[in-house]
Amino acid sequence: MLGRIEGFSERIGSIYGYTKVGIVHFKAFPDVARGEGPIAETLAKIAEDDFFTAVEVGWMRDPRVRNGARKLLEEAHLAVYYATQPAMLTQKLSLNALDPAERRRAIGQVKNCIDEAYDLGARAVRLIAGKDPGPEKRPEAMKLLVDSIHQLCEYAKEEGEIAVVLKIFDRDVDKQNLIGPFSDALALAEEVSKEQPRFGLLADLSHFPLLREKPEEAVPLVRAYLKHAHIGNCVMRDRRHPAYGDLQPRFGVPGGEIDTEQVADYLGVLWNNGFFHQEEMPVISAEVRPLLAGEREEVILANAKRVIKEAWALFQRSRSL
């Protein structure tokens, strides 16, 4: 429920003065999620829409497609961020795999993703941890993940400055990820940042219900490392629901957890924890997709834009009450 937000004395103004506003390309247009399909055509739809000032892209297997995408994104003046998630999940790769050969393969794939990110002019690369091996092997998996991230941060430095960010997922509902609860994300970030000060975290609004955590309690834990944010929706109360789990349905889907009011509240939590006042402008991206029968990509995009506009307005209003 929106309430009065701390530390304000003036009207905030446009969202664009505080953050890049992005969309996750391979979720908005699921046909490109495996690194193939109508990548150029769907990216063009985002490039033509001046609501978005950033785009999160993923795997593009064809170098010619990447070259065309870079040209398009430069022309559109879009900030670009690269997600390794499509390449990693489709191949079932894990940066914390206990098997050395499997972990080497995962690290190799992410290095290829970093190369792609440079080709596309990306400002940051987003990582995903692997499956949680269970409580007994969790400490070992955490050490392996720290080592993998360190290797990848060093690799990213070889060609230039590109930020490396890890996204926080659920532990036991859908992705069953090592990272995981926000307390574990904090421990990881503290360890990695000892040698990699640019390393950061990404918090997704749709994952708080899946983690059974509240943004107002979890975000302060990681505020020093929180660089990016996602807004999305999830269904978790009914296992029979076709959108159950971490499937990124549209905002306001029946049975879902997130709608405009929750997004507005999240913006307030981020504001109170300094997210919008970083030295380098952050990015908030909508991660939603057409999921239920008959849903159209263009309508789901419009849904997300309306929610962002209204949520920011509600957030502004809460600061003037």
Q: For each of these PLM feature ranges, what is it?
A:
Residues 238-252, 278-297:
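Active-site clefts of carbohydrate-active enzymes
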Residues 55, 156-253, 315, 319:
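Acidic/histidine-rich catalytic cores of soluble enzymes
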Residues 19-27, 53-57, 78-85, 125-127, ...:
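Hydrophobic faces of well-ordered beta-strands that scaffold small-molecule active sites
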Residues 70-81, 135-149, 177-191, 216-225, ...:
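Short, electropositive alpha-helical surface patch
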Residues 1-112, 118, 196-198, 302-321:
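N-terminal pre-domain/capping segments
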Residues 3-12, 96-200, 303-304, 318-319:
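Active-site acidic/histidine proton-transfer and metal-coordination neighborhood
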Residues 29-36, 54-69, 133-136, 172-178, ...:
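Acidic-and-aromatic substrate-binding clefts and catalytic sites of carbohydrate-active enzymes
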Residues 10, 255-277:
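A short, acidic, amphipathic alpha-helical segment used as a generic capping/interface helix at domain edges
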